[in-house]
């Protein structure tokens, strides 16, 4: 080939410029010596080997269509621009596969492989495990960059790791994750996980920096919903949960093959827990729930937002402010009873205990909710979405400034601790269940059984709070310290509630504000319980020994008991 090419080039270069080349390949000089099916093109590189490039198609017809001429500089450099005329090139009908740029100069001819960066259009699927194969027990090293992209996904089902945004290899520990993050989380939950962030616990975790901070990586694993029992549970119900589970927003932003964004399964906890939660709560109450399932139930029990639905005129007066606050409190009390009934295990307590717990804790629950709503608004108290007061605006109410300052201080402390919603709902449930401790004086068998259930429920909610704290990714020592800080705030809220009761009672005595039935009953019951301890009386109206004509204890005639009974009847009718 090389020996025959040199005289060919000499013949072409030796032609006189006055004799133009013919336009058609069939009229080229015979010195070229090339058949119609091949084109001999010298290589521009320094090597001496030359090869023929064959078109994937039949030979050119007798009267071929002339394609636009290509510059000779695409094939070899010319010392004289007039020394070589334009060389027409006949294009073949179709290539076996489509390239994005066909007429580029010297397209790379290396074979297409199904490597990591090759196009998904050139391969039907990647190689690896199916998502429903679970987490497996292989000891994989997350330091291997290829291990994180070896997931088995069809083009339309491609997913990304919710932790580092690399290609997901499957559904591991309750979320879509790559092999590296799966192996890291497995090692963390099985062995040493006392990681400490060298910075501020806000390190960026992505595909390139996922190994820079183990503490922040583990924290993000928990934030995105990875859990120890998630993989085994999801292994059986993967297809069903994938069809029916709603999606949530997360910090990750995965994109599909065509660039379409995919929403991640959002949640502080995975949504697939909803089906086992409903079955367990119907069959065995809270005793059949794991801590994460209990947290999910308490989250679902959260009441909706409230509105005052009226505009307060400025300047504010003592009567207008107190009237607005009591109206909001009365609305929240109605929702609070429904909220308490949705906490797993609460309806298993006796009616007397349910009423007693609500009467003891209602203002603490309201104040905790007020602090939570105000956590992102420094210097303001968000009583409702349409009633926001700062410290100066509350100065018109006599004796309320100390309460305002304590509320702002509590909200500021929650903001410093970066309180999570899972922790907040657990604290609120603890306030409800731990509000009254004098029920030990009751000797009735029903009440003793109810109190035993209450203590078990209190332990379960405490375990749920510990689990919620463990999701923050802190070390064991830091988790213990955080638990202590959160529980110490409950005593602050109890002290604040007592001051609020005294202030509301003074407003009632001065006739500054008109209290509604439910709020008035709650206030009177709380003040009565703070003055003395009730005598030991069997107060369960369901006791068989109780005659239908036997008068009920006074607390069971209250509006609270009426609302609790109404909720019980409505739930029974729905079932």
UniProtKB/Swiss-Prot annotation:
Superkingdom assignment: Eukaryota
Molecular function, one GO term: DNA binding
DNA-binding region range list: 161-226
UniProt key word Transcription: yes
CDD domains: NR_DBD_ER (cd07171), NR_LBD_ER (cd06949)
Biased composition (Acidic residues): 134-145
Keywords associated with the record: DNA-binding, Lipid-binding, Metal-binding, Nucleus, Receptor, Steroid-binding, Transcription, Transcription regulation, Zinc, Zinc-finger
Any one Gene Ontology cellular component term annotated for this protein: membrane
SUPFAM superfamilies for this protein: Glucocorticoid receptor-like (DNA-binding domain) (SSF57716), Nuclear receptor ligand-binding domain (SSF48508)
Localization, UniProt: Nucleus
GO biological-process terms attached to the record: cellular response to estradiol stimulus; estrogen receptor signaling pathway; gonad development; response to xenobiotic stimulus
Region (Disordered): 108-151, 537-557
Annotated InterPro entries: ER-beta-like_N, ER-beta/gamma, Est_rcpt/est-rel_rcp, NHR-like_dom_sf, Nucl_hrmn_rcpt_lig-bd, Nuclear_hormone_rcpt_NR3, Nuclear_hrmn_rcpt, Znf_hrmn_rcpt
Zn finger region (NR C4-type): 161-181, 197-221
Swiss-Prot/TrEMBL domain comment: Composed of three domains: a modulating N-terminal domain, a DNA-binding domain and a C-terminal ligand-binding domain.
Subunit structure: Binds DNA as a homodimer. Can form a heterodimer with ER-alpha.
Protein name from the UniProt record: Estrogen receptor beta
Origin species: Ictalurus punctatus
Organism phylogeny: Eukaryota, Metazoa, Chordata, Craniata, Vertebrata
């Amino acid at each position: 080939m090389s020996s025959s090419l040199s005289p060919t080039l000499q013949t072409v270069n030796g032609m006189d410029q006055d004799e133009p080349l013919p336009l058609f390949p069939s009229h080229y000089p015979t010195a070229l010596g090339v058949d119609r099916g091949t084109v001999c093109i010298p290589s521009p590189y320094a090597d001496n080997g030359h090869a023929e490039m064959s078109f994937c198609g039949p030979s050119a017809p007798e009267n071929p269509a002339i394609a636009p001429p290509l510059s000779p500089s695409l094939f070899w450099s010319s010392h004289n621009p007039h020394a070589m005329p334009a060389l027409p090139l006949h294009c073949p009908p179709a290539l076996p596969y489509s390239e994005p740029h066909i007429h580029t100069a010297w397209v790379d001819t290396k074979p297409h492989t199904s490597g990591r960066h090759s196009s998904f259009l050139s391969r039907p699927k990647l190689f690896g495990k199916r998502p429903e194969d679970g987490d497996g027990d292989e000891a994989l090293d997350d330091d291997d960059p290829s291990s994180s992209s070896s997931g088995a996904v069809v083009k339309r089902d491609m997913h990304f790791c919710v932790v580092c945004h690399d290609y997901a290899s499957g559904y591991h520990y309750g979320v879509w994750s790559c092999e590296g993050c799966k192996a890291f989380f497995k090692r963390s939950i099985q062995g040493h996980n006392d990681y400490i962030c060298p910075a501020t616990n806000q390190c960026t975790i992505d595909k390139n920096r996922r190994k820079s901070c183990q503490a922040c990586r583990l924290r993000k694993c928990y934030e995105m919903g990875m859990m120890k029992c998630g993989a085994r549970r999801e292994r059986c119900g993967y297809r069903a949960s994938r069809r029916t589970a709603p999606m949530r927003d997360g910090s990750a932003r995965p994109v599909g093959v065509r660039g379409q964004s995919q929403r991640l399964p959002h949640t502080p906890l995975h949504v697939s827990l909803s089906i086992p939660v409903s079955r367990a709560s119907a069959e065995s109450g809270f005793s059949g729930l794991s801590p994460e399932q209990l947290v999910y139930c308490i989250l679902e029990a959260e009441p909706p937002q409230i509105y005052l639905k009226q505009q307060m005129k400025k300047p504010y007066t003592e009567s207008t402010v107190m009237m607005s606050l009591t109206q909001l409190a009365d609305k929240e009390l109605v929702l609070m009873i429904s909220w308490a009934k949705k906490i797993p295990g609460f309806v298993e307590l006796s009616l007397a205990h349910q009423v007693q717990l609500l009467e003891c804790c209602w203002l603490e629950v309201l104040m905790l909710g007020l602090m939570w709503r105000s956590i992102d608004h420094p210097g303001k108290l968000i009583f409702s979405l349409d009633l926001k007061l700062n410290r100066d605006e509350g100065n018109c109410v006599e004796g309320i400034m100390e309460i305002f300052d304590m509320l702002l201080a509590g909200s500021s402390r929650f903001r410093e601790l970066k309180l999570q919603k899972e922790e907040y709902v657990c604290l609120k449930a603890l306030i409800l269940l731990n509000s009254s401790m004098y029920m030990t004086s009751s000797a009735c068998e029903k009440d003793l059984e109810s109190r035993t259930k209450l203590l078990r429920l209190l332990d379960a909610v405490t375990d749920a709070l510990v689990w919620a704290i463990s999701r923050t990714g802190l070390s064991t020592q830091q988790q213990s310290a955080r638990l202590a800080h959160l529980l110490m705030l409950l005593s602050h809220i109890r002290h604040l509630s007592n001051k609020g009761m005294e202030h509301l009672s003074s407003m009632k005595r001065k006739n500054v504000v008109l209290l509604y039935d439910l709020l008035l009953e709650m206030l009177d019951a709380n003040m009565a319980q703070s003055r003395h301890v009730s005598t030991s009386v069997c107060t369960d109206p369901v006791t068989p020994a109780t005659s239908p004509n036997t008068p009920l204890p006074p607390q069971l005639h209250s509006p609270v008991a009426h609302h609790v009974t109404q909720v019980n009847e409505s739930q029974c009718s729905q079932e």
